[in-house]
Amino acid sequence: MMEALAERLSALQDRILELYEADSKDLKDQIEHWKCVRQECAVLYKAREVGFSHLNHQVVPSLTVSRAKAHKAIEVQLALESLQNSEYNNEEWTLQDASLEMWHTEPKGCFKKTGVPVTVLFDCDKDNTMEYVLWGHIYVWGDNGWVKTFGEADNWGLHYTVAGEKVYYVQFYEDAKKYGHGNGNGDGYEWEVHVGGTVMHYSDSVSSATHCDKLPTVEIVSGLQHINPSPPPANPSAKENVWSSPAKRVRRSDSGGDPVRALDGKSRSVLCGSAHNNATGSSGDSDYTPIVHLKGESNCLKCLRFRLGKHKHLYINISSTWRWANHASEKAIVTVTFANELQRQQFLNTVKIPSTVTLSQGVMTV
């Protein structure tokens, strides 16, 4: 039985990685992806049920974990299959559009596309900010099936309208109570909303959501052509694709020093710490080793790590999947270490990284 389960698991994981690498925009392929994920969970569940702790050198998760992952896969698969029967089935649907992370991003239980960042300054303080995502296209399940609408922003929050009903998926007042100071009596909060080239200000004793009908609104329609984009951030640590992440808290810095700068997947230089390159391509300090962080969905990274076993001569060590404990994102990370930067460059030139995986470079102490 172990051999049969191992062969089935290997075939499913190979197919999943093929779908990641193909980066298809066909809804049928996204449905197939989630079918494979569901079947993978079923194989792992069966393996654990009969007492196997490892399969294909992979740790078999507990029954509870496999069951929970299968339920999530079924949820997304059924939603996509119902979308396949709608008028929106011929639109472009990427793996990211159909990902579990996107499904659980606010507004939850909806499909979203074409997001832009919205920055809110609580107390109108640039050091006390929160970032949100305003979606250009939102697909909402209603009484008559899927309905496509668009996101809107006003001083009160982010919302969409379906069947004449305005639905807020972010209310700034709720976060103002958490992060703002107000007047100390539970009101008197103020904030600024920055979206595209528009700035909206709110300052009042906020006590009722009825205020929102009186506030100006910014609409995001058809690829955001109604808003002039903001200039790119000067801070090199800022992410370009802010819209693809859930809202993230930006806290005040306790020190005046610059943070360690993250590198994007296109960067080929090390900007982290005090390590410098010498003529041999090695780190100037023997205590530092070049690394690559691979960030993406846990299942994709596990399949990729399995494939990287064929390229062991191109790296020194590779970690298991891990996550930041205090990070809101569900994305997992795999870290790869190298003997020197020349080996890392050979790795980058040889290994094909799926487009759904984010690659960043840096160094770490050893």
From Swiss-Prot:
Report whether Transcription shows up as a keyword of the record: yes
Biological process, per Gene Ontology: DNA replication; DNA-templated transcription; regulation of DNA replication; viral DNA genome replication
Region entry Disordered: which residue ranges?
224-261
Indicate the cross-link positions, Glycyl lysine isopeptide (Lys-Gly) (interchain with G-Cter in SUMO): 295
**Signal peptide span per the entry?**
none
Q: Which Pfam families match?
A: PPV_E2_C, PPV_E2_N
What does the record give under GO molecular function? Answer: DNA binding; DNA-binding transcription factor activity; nucleotide binding
The UniProt keyword set, sorted, is: Activator, DNA replication, DNA-binding, Early protein, Host nucleus, Isopeptide bond, Phosphoprotein, Repressor, Transcription, Transcription regulation, Ubl conjugation
Where it mainly occurs, coarsely classed, is host cell
Segments carrying the region annotation (Transactivation domain) are 1-207
Q: Where in the cell is it found?
A: Host nucleus
**Cross-referenced SUPFAM superfamilies:** E2 regulatory, transactivation domain, Viral DNA-binding domain
Q: Which GO terms describe its cellular component?
A: host cell nucleus
User: Region annotation DNA-binding domain: residue ranges?
Assistant: 289-366
The PTM entry states: Phosphorylated.
Q: Which family is this sequence assigned to?
A: Belongs to the papillomaviridae E2 protein family.
Cite the record's note on assembly.
Binds DNA as homodimer. Interacts with protein E1; this interaction greatly increases E1 DNA-binding activity. Interacts with protein L1; this interaction enhances E2-dependent replication and transcription activation. Interacts with protein L2; this interaction inhibits E2 transcriptional activity but not DNA replication function E2. Interacts with protein E7; this interaction inhibits E7 oncogenic activity. Interacts with host TAF1; this interaction modulates E2-dependent transcriptional regulation. Interacts with host BRD4; this interaction mediates E2 transcriptional activation function.
Q: State what this protein does.
A: Plays a role in the initiation of viral DNA replication. A dimer of E2 interacts with a dimer of E1 in order to improve specificity of E1 DNA binding activity. Once the complex recognizes and binds DNA at specific sites, the E2 dimer is removed from DNA. E2 also regulates viral transcription through binding to the E2RE response element (5'-ACCNNNNNNGGT-3') present in multiple copies in the regulatory regions of the viral genome. Activates or represses transcription depending on E2RE's position with regards to proximal promoter elements including the TATA-box.
This chain's protein is named Regulatory protein E2
